[in-house]
Amino acid sequence: IGAMSAHGAVATGIATLTSDHTVLDVWYPEPELGAASSSGHAVLSGDEVPAELASLTGPDEDRGVERVAVRVEISDLTEPPADAYDAYLRLHLISHRLIRPHFANMDGLFGKLTNVVWTNFGPCAVPGFESVRARLRARGPVTVYGVDKFPRMVDYVVPSGVRIADADRVRLGAHLAEGTTVMHEGFVNFNAGTLGASMVEGRISAGVVVGADSDVGGGASIMGTLSGGGKETISIGERCLLGANSGVGISLGDDCVVEAGLYVTAGTKVDVRAGAWAEREPVKAGQLSGMDNLLFRRNSVSGAVEAVPWKREGVELNADLHAND
């Protein structure tokens, strides 16, 4: 991504604020990378508000919120997010594919966001929501999509060339490369995603990136770093396959396979049947992290986890399933 050499970002959008100025969400239709002299946000008024956004501003008394136009600048994306306006812009930059996961500093981002009731009428504050629900019911049925700090990506960004079978399964801040298909059981967290055409039928946890032409099989799991004290960032290389209900707590290089039902954590003891490792004692899987051309399998007789050489042609995706025009 050529524009990723830029270290700043700017955007104009619509923020939803409660009466105490808590930020429930911010939508930036056209964020940009570019130099910014300073970081911060400014509320726009009058002629400062772009014509296409003017009709979106104003109070929503039923929800108890005010919608305002804002201009937000970030001078240095390598610095942690300063506030919710900043945090939402970083999430938009990733989902708009202007930056890749890990390009921007996301330290402390979770704490900058507030818990929100996401409804078909827009974001609402959690405190007092039942009164809000009662007022909204006069407009029609009230659907609550979730109570969370992160909204669904597709309510803010719909990237070109992707298929998402269930919108609830992709958070704002996910990076879906052109040609990516996320099926009903797939899930992609924020600051994570795919770097090329991929099939996602399992879970891509926060911080995880998956290389081009890889397949995350049904129910497969890739360990993230949000909970459990984990610091290791997991990546999956190109042309890899995670079999159904498999999982990894190590990175895979290119052209690797984990057989269905096998979970390989960093501490899993592995009998290596490849190259210079072949005659050694079992090693911890963490020592194999990032290596290319390995098939991880469980010996059905001995029960031992083995790593054996895997063909260099790797995994081939069905092109028809990824022509997402």
Regions of interest found by a model, annotated:
Residues 133-196:
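Glycine-rich adenosyl-nucleotide cofactor-binding module
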Residues 1-159, 287-325:
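Terminal amphipathic alpha-helical/low-complexity segments used for targeting or macromolecular assembly
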Residues 205, 209-212, 216-325:
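Glycine-rich hexapeptide-repeat left-handed beta-helix
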Residues 106-110, 183, 197-199:
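Short, surface-exposed recognition loops or helix-turn segments adjacent to catalytic cores
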